[in-house]
Amino acid sequence: MLMIHSVANGLNHFCTWVMRLAYLNVLWILFSLAGLVVFGLMPATAAMFTVAREWAKGNTDAPVFSVFFRTFKKEWRASQILGLIVVTAALFLFADMRIAAQMDQPVLVNVFVSISLIFAFVVLYVFPVFSHFDVKIREVLSISFFIAFSRPAVTLLMAAGAVGVLCLVLFHVTFLLFFSGSLLSLILTKLSFKAFRSMDQRQEKEKAA
């Protein structure tokens, strides 16, 4: 009986998380589409990571829609600026890589591939940092860069998690519709949380001193 009860509890816990993630992902997609993607994707992503942050803190009973909608409105402008910077940088890197490849410059291609890899590692932290720290956009980028390379093990785990989610999305469209963004945001937030806590503790010590 005890074993059956344990299995039932585990199954219930699993189903609860599946529903949470699916609901959050649907909100992310709907709000992105409501803003015609261009005007909705970044604030919806910021809102999704804010909900994931609440879950990572253990606040699993947080009102998902209220937190999501409040963040979407509050961070609309800042998240758009942040997204514009990230997307513009990514497009520049992609264009430079294509030009170098067309000019048959393997050394330059390798340089841009290396820069793109560094950029990708930093981007993994951008929205977790944005949702966790109350700082300016410039500081979001500098903190993301600092943590990405001061915590290489965490960064590699985050990259592996992102690749894993991508594989699931490519496996079946169901994962795209219900888990692509929400699962990724939860993985990245949970993994980055330890680094954030150490930074928070350091800031508290500096303030106390």
Swiss-Prot record:
Subcellular locations according to the entry: Cell membrane
Annotated membrane topology: Multi-pass membrane protein
Annotated InterPro entries: DUF624
Disulfide-bonded cysteines: none
Pfam families given in the database record: DUF624
Keyword Cell cycle listed: no
A GO CC term attached to the entry: plasma membrane
Keyword annotations: Cell membrane, Membrane, Transmembrane, Transmembrane helix
Origin: domain of life: Bacteria
Parts of the chain that traverse the membrane: 21-41, 81-101, 107-127, 159-179
Keyword Membrane applies: yes
UniProt name for this protein: Uncharacterized protein YesL
Native species: Bacillus subtilis (strain 168)
